[in-house]
């Protein structure tokens, strides 16, 4: 499928390590568009703002992220969310009645527990006086939960909020067909035998065909994998580059797992099964093995495969967010400040997965920072091709000028600072829970390495995106 982007993106910059070495021309910086100002450097010791509350992450946890169809397959989403909440309670010893509000993100709703935040909170033993609500924003659902918590605290409505997310891909709701649903509802309303027999006479075998959850984008009728394949082609990202990046993610995740850096994980005793203590999707392979896989979406010439895509994952995360004053009054040592954040949206057809490209310069400007000020980058890895396409877009003056209305590029993140403990490709991606994992990875990396600022960014279905600045809490 050829679009205007396919013909124009091939003109992007090649300064990224991952760019192709041929058939790409240099970019011009002479656009006459009315552009947004370039990011300006501001030297700051902290991003604290006068007369505004400092909002901190006290702690964040997640249960192990598992391949769907494995140890969590017989559970319900609220079981996973409850386990994450229980793990947070155990690690922080926060009195349950101190929590003012609970917010969880999720994408595919379990119909029996439409407000999974409330059901999980009750199951974890929180006070029945503590309100809870569930939010959905595709892959940035728990990001939305976190920033909603920030808003509640900043406005003075709350001092202590728990935010998190959950997804159970092992048991997604599968509905009867619409014709079957209509017949069943009508049968329930029928008052006489004659009415029931009349309705049953209209039954057809194809009524029994199930209605699966939508995989394609509603607005474009295109799957995200298909969009990733087109995006990779438009930005001239090769199959080899995608496989190399995926191997990097898995190798770094394995190293982080072995060295104990994934400290946000809390063990989960699965009822009737063993205790789960670590992610099970990390699978360092070889480029030779990865090259044997066939394209998963655009066949036979696509470049997106099972190996360079994130996998269906079950998991949950939870985070304790407080005003700094309240945290210190209760004797906690926070892990990080949650600073500026931004949400963006763009064309879901051709730019579905470019959320980080659009969000990054905006959040940097909001915070008065540049890419050079950032010590740790944590981006959601939906697909290798998505990450590498974002790198190229971020490193392109041409793209900045022609698609973003900016004078200059923001620049691509240096790999030595980027997702160095693995990412969604290797650790897994429970849609509703990934945002909290990203923020905790950023906070923990800053603490370990002595950095000051981290930048978290993610794309999401619908052509949306998010970015946030995380600032280390002084040791």
From Swiss-Prot:
Q: Which GO terms describe its cellular component?
A: endoplasmic reticulum; mitochondrial fatty acid beta-oxidation multienzyme complex; mitochondrial inner membrane; mitochondrial nucleoid; mitochondrial outer membrane; mitochondrion; nucleoplasm
Biological process (GO), any one: cellular response to lipopolysaccharide
The PTM N6-acetyllysine maps to 73, 189, 294, 299, 333, 349, 362
* Interval spanned by the transit peptide: 1-34
Catalysed transformations (reactions):
an acyl-CoA + acetyl-CoA = a 3-oxoacyl-CoA + CoA; butanoyl-CoA + acetyl-CoA = 3-oxohexanoyl-CoA + CoA; hexanoyl-CoA + acetyl-CoA = 3-oxooctanoyl-CoA + CoA; octanoyl-CoA + acetyl-CoA = 3-oxodecanoyl-CoA + CoA
Those portions of the chain lying inside the lipid bilayer but not traversing it, as listed in its UniProt record, are located at 174-221
Sites marked Increases nucleophilicity of active site Cys: 429
Q: Which residues form a coiled coil?
A: none
Q: Annotated pathway, please?
A: Lipid metabolism; fatty acid beta-oxidation
Alphabetical keyword list:
Acetylation, Acyltransferase, Endoplasmic reticulum, Fatty acid metabolism, Lipid metabolism, Membrane, Mitochondrion, Mitochondrion inner membrane, Mitochondrion outer membrane, Transferase, Transit peptide
N6-succinyllysine sites (modified residues): 53, 73, 189, 191, 273, 292, 294, 333
Localization recorded for this chain is: Mitochondrion; Mitochondrion inner membrane; Mitochondrion outer membrane; Endoplasmic reticulum
Matches recorded under InterPro entries = Thiolase (IPR002155), Thiolase-like (IPR016039), Thiolase_acyl_enz_int_AS (IPR020615), Thiolase_AS (IPR020610), Thiolase_C (IPR020617), Thiolase_CS (IPR020613), Thiolase_N (IPR020616)
Q: Which PANTHER family match?
A: ACETYL-COA C-ACYLTRANSFERASE, TRIFUNCTIONAL ENZYME SUBUNIT BETA, MITOCHONDRIAL
Family the UniProt entry places it in: Belongs to the thiolase-like superfamily. Thiolase family.
Q: What is this protein called?
A: Trifunctional enzyme subunit beta, mitochondrial
Q: Which organism is it from?
A: Mus musculus (Mouse)
Gene field: Hadhb
């Amino acid at each position: 499928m050829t679009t205007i982007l396919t013909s124009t993106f091939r003109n992007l910059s090649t300064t990224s390590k991952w760019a192709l070495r041929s058939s790409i021309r240099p970019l011009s910086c002479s656009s006459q568009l009315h552009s947004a100002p370039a990011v300006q450097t501001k030297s700051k010791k902290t991003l604290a703002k006068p007369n505004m509350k400092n909002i901190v992450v006290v702690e964040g946890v997640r249960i192990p992220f598992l391949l769907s169809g494995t140890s969590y397959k017989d559970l319900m989403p609220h079981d996973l969310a409850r386990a994450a909440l229980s793990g947070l309670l155990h690690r922080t010893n926060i009195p349950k009645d101190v929590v003012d509000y609970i917010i969880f993100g999720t994408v595919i709703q379990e119909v029996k527990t439409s407000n999974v935040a409330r059901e999980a909170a009750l199951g974890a033993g929180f006070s029945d006086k503590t309100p809870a609500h569930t939010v959905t924003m595709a892959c940035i659902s728990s990001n939305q939960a976190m920033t909603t918590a920030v808003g509640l605290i900043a406005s003075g409505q709350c001092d202590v909020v728990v935010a998190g997310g959950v997804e159970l891909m092992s048991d997604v709701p599968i509905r009867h067909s619409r014709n079957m649903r209509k017949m069943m509802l009508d049968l329930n309303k029928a008052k006489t035998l004659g009415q029931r027999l009349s309705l049953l006479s209209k039954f057809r075998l194809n009524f029994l065909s199930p209605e699966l959850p939508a995989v394609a984008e509603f607005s474009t009728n295109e799957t995200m994998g298909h969009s990733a394949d087109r995006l990779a082609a438009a930005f001239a990202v090769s199959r080899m580059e995608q496989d190399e990046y995926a191997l990097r993610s898995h190798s770094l995740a394995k190293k982080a797992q072995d060295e104990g850096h994934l400290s946000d994980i809390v063990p989960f005793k699965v009822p009737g099964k063993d205790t789960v203590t670590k992610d099970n999707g990390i699978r360092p392979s070889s480029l030779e093995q990865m090259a044997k896989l066939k394209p998963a979406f655009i066949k036979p010439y696509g470049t997106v495969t099972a190996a360079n895509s994130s996998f269906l994952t079950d998991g949950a995360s939870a985070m304790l967010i407080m005003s700094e004053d309240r945290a210190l009054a209760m004797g906690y040592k926070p892990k990080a400040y949650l600073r500026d954040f931004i949400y963006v949206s763009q064309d879901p057809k051709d730019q579905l997965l470019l959320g980080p490209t659009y969000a990054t310069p905006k959040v940097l400007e909001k915070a008065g920072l540049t890419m050079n000020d950032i010590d740790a980058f944590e981006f959601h890895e939906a697909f290798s091709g998505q990450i590498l396409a974002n790198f190229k877009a971020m490193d392109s003056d041409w793209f900045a000028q022609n698609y973003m209305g900016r004078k200059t590029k923001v620049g691509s993140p240096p790999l030595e600072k980027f997702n160095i403990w693995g990412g969604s490709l290797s650790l897994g991606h429970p849609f509703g829970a990934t945002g909290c994992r990203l923020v905790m990875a950023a906070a923990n990396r800053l603490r370990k390495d002595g950095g000051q600022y981290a930048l978290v960014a993610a794309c999401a279905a619908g052509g949306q995106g998010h970015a946030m600045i995380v600032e280390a809490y002084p040791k």
